[in-house]
Amino acid sequence: MAKLLALTLVGLVLALYKNHRSSYQTRLNAFREVTPVELPNCNLVKGIETGAEDLEILPNGLTFFSTGLKYPGIKSFDPSKPGKILLMDLNKKEPAVSELEIIGNTLDISSFNPHGISTFTDEDNTVYLLVVNHPDSSSTVEVFKFQEEERSLLHLKTITHELLPSINDIAAIGPESFYATNDHYFADPYLRSWEMYLGLSWSNVVYYSPDKVQVVAEGFDFANGIGISLDGKYVYIAELLAHKIHVYEKHANWTLTPLKVLNFDTLVDNISVDPVTGDLWVGCHPNGMRIFFYDAENPPGSEVLRIQNILSEDPKITVVYAENGTVLQGTTVASVYKGKLLIGTVFHKALYCDL
């Protein structure tokens, strides 16, 4: 009888493990292969070799890149060097990147590890760049003032809060105010790995201002990219491991109400809102297994989606670019400027294409 009970327990454990492993593979889209979609006249951005996890294009074509991210469980081609913020002018015939010098003695440059970024332009045309930073595996938001003539960033402030333990991306709504996604509930790398493996869906979105901080949405399986509609009425949130983009209605008190959900056959990362049309441009990972378990012989592919009329009953979703990793590995972000598409990756290169 004891042997039968033991055998039954072993069988149950194995069945649960097999079922959970299948669920984990589904969340990572482990068996997805890429069908290539090409664009004309694509060129790699010179000077980006260790990723451009996020990017922001100003109305005048100046573009900020967040580069050199070191993230637990993700490949890094230069793990010993700090990250950088790069600048590129998309109006140039052959645009090239240059490093923005960080001014001020309040930021430890040696541990600078930039992730998501967002800009806010004040009424006097002052441009603030808000940067998610992971110094020593922690999470902060660094507030910079962009000094265009000097081509530098003046560090103004470091923001930390207990409700911001694992920030991934931010959407700035003021010089020190923003919505932020926490991709995990825990900050500890060991607990984060179990949280992700078990699919606990404990990540959330937080509204932060100097006067008020609150969780405004929760229950996500790895909340990732976030964007705000052109009219400021809606917030878009990418749920990476559920393959979803959520649309929320934004209220005057900064709370959010869920409106609709779109499902995809890819892991949706950062969201950029087209400044002309309001379309969403989304950097995606077709196969998440290849991102989290990197193999140079079988690298992660890249995919860019365009979502038109997202608020309608029948949004139009187009795969604008897709590639199996021979050119671009691990796309995280895509944005447009005057008929050009700029694509960034988590640890690899960046691409610049005609549309």
Swiss-Prot record:
Q: Which residues form the active site?
A: 115
The GO molecular function terms of this record are:
acyl-L-homoserine-lactone lactonohydrolase activity; aryldialkylphosphatase activity; arylesterase activity; calcium ion binding; high-density lipoprotein particle binding; phospholipid binding; protein homodimerization activity
Checking SUPFAM superfamilies in the record gives: Calcium-dependent phosphotriesterase
Binding of Ca(2+) 1: at which residues? 53, 168, 224, 269-270
* Cellular compartments per GO CC: spherical high-density lipoprotein particle
How does it associate, per the subunit comment?
Homodimer. Interacts with CLU.
Q: Which residues are glycosylated?
A: 253, 270, 324
* Record text on cofactor binding: Binds 2 calcium ions per subunit.
Matches recorded under Pfam families = Arylesterase
Q: What the protein does?
A: Hydrolyzes the toxic metabolites of a variety of organophosphorus insecticides. Capable of hydrolyzing a broad spectrum of organophosphate substrates and lactones, and a number of aromatic carboxylic acid esters. Mediates an enzymatic protection of low density lipoproteins against oxidative modification.
Which intervals of the chain form a coiled coil?
none
What catalytic activity does the UniProt entry give for this protein? a phenyl acetate + H2O = a phenol + acetate + H(+); An aryl dialkyl phosphate + H2O = dialkyl phosphate + an aryl alcohol; an N-acyl-L-homoserine lactone + H2O = an N-acyl-L-homoserine + H(+)
Kindly state the tissue distribution recorded for this protein.
Answer: Plasma, liver, kidney, heart, brain, small intestine and lung. In the plasma, associated with HDL.
Q: What is this protein called?
A: Serum paraoxonase/arylesterase 1
- Localization (cell): Secreted, Extracellular space
Family according to the record: Belongs to the paraoxonase family.
What species does this protein belong to?
Mus musculus
Q: What else is known?
A: The preferential association of PON1 with HDL is mediated in part by its signal peptide, by binding phospholipids directly, rather than binding apo AI. The retained signal peptide may allow transfer of the protein between phospholipid surfaces.
Per UniProt, Ca(2+) 2 binds at 54, 117, 169
One of its GO biological process terms is: response to toxic substance
Q: Which cofactor does it need?
A: Ca(2+)
Keyword annotations? Calcium, Disulfide bond, Glycoprotein, HDL, Hydrolase, Metal-binding, Secreted, Signal
